[in-house]
Each structure stands twice: as structure tokens, then as C-alpha cells.
Curated annotation (Swiss-Prot):
Originating species: Rubrivivax gelatinosus
Name listed for the protein in its UniProt record: Light-harvesting protein B-870 alpha chain
Function text: Antenna complexes are light-harvesting systems, which transfer the excitation energy to the reaction centers.
InterPro entries the record matches: Antenna_a/b, Antenna_alpha, Antenna_alpha_CS, Light-harvesting_complex
Keyword set includes Lipid biosynthesis: no
Length: 67
């Protein structure tokens, strides 16, 4: 295993690993912020309350004739 470091510079390998892990962390956090469930900045968006649609009453004939 020690011979691998004769091929690669240890400092460059650690810097490359740190840059890769930082990029991966940023990517994961941005993906989570894009979801509704895991967005900790805006909070979870609540579903709109279901409203019952009332039927429109038919025109009353006695009021229509009074006009």
C-alpha cells in the first residue's frame, strides 16, 4: 500500500479528495433544499385546505317574478 504514494503526491490527493467531498456536500444540500419535505429554510409548505364546493342554488321563481 505504501507504494501507491510513490505514484501520487499525498498533498495533491488530499486536496483533490477535500474538493470532491465539498462539492458532493454542496450538491446534496442543494438537492435537499429543492425538495418540499427537507427544505429547512422555508419550512415544509402546507397543503392547501380542502374547501367544500357548495352547489349554486337554483333561482327562486317567486323572486324572479317580483323583479
Amino acid at each position: 500500500m505504501w507504494r501507491i504514494w510513490r505514484l501520487f503526491d499525498p498533498m495533491r490527493a488530499m486536496v483533490a479528495q477535500a474538493v470532491f467531498l465539498l462539492g458532493l456536500a454542496v450538491l446534496i444540500h442543494l438537492m435537499l433544499l429543492g425538495t418540499n419535505k427537507y427544505n429547512w429554510l422555508d419550512g415544509a409548505k402546507k397543503a392547501p385546505a380542502a374547501t367544500a364546493v357548495a352547489p349554486v342554488p337554483a333561482e327562486v321563481t317567486s323572486l324572479a317574478q317580483a323583479k
